[in-house]
């Protein structure tokens, strides 16, 4: 069992290796939809895991994951290889998750205020 888990972890590290993701980012910046599909395939678990760790809600984490890849598609031309492509993508997902949490807080505050008015 431990060997299987170690193998899976190694496969995940290999799938998100910067030397594999960098060319995808260049293709993505050129509008290559297949590059987006491959980037999604290689990084979706990491992006979803980060979103879920912030949001603690599967539905919201799925929304943030989808939105992160949409933003990556729209802004790939702005990617600068100062870090890794995965770090860039996770930063997008983190920012979207934080926005979702702030939005959730405002909604809850409004509902509480409405409740107190009754």
Predicted regions located by residue number:
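Helix-turn-helix/winged-helix DNA-binding modules
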Residues: 31, 52-53, 80-81
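Intrinsic, short, N-terminal disordered tails of RNA polymerase sigma-factor systems
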Residues: 1-30, 34, 38-41, 106, ...
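Structural recognition of an alpha-helix C-terminal capping motif at a helix-to-coil junction
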Residues: 49, 63-70, 83-95
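Active-site phosphate/pyrophosphate-handling residues
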Residues: 23, 34, 46, 67, ...
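A short, glycine- and basic residue-enriched loop/turn
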Residues: 44, 58, 62, 76-82, ...
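Arg/Lys-rich amphipathic alpha helix in sigma70-family domain 2
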Residues: 74-81, 91-112
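Amphipathic, Lys/Arg- and hydrophobic-enriched alpha-helical face
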Residues: 40-58, 75, 90
């Amino acid at each position: 069992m431990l060997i299987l888990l170690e193998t899976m972890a190694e496969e995940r590290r290999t799938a998100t290796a910067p030397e594999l993701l960098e060319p995808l980012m260049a293709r993505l910046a050129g509008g290559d939809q297949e590059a987006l599909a491959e980037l999604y395939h290689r990084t979706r678990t990491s992006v979803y895991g980060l979103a879920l760790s912030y949001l603690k809600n599967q539905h919201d984490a799925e929304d943030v994951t989808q939105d992160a890849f949409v933003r990556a598609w729209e802004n790939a031309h702005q990617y600068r290889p100062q870090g890794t492509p995965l770090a860039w993508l996770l930063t997008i997902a983190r920012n979207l998750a934080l926005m979702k949490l702030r939005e959730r807080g405002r909604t809850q505050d409004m509902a509480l205020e409405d409740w107190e008015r009754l």
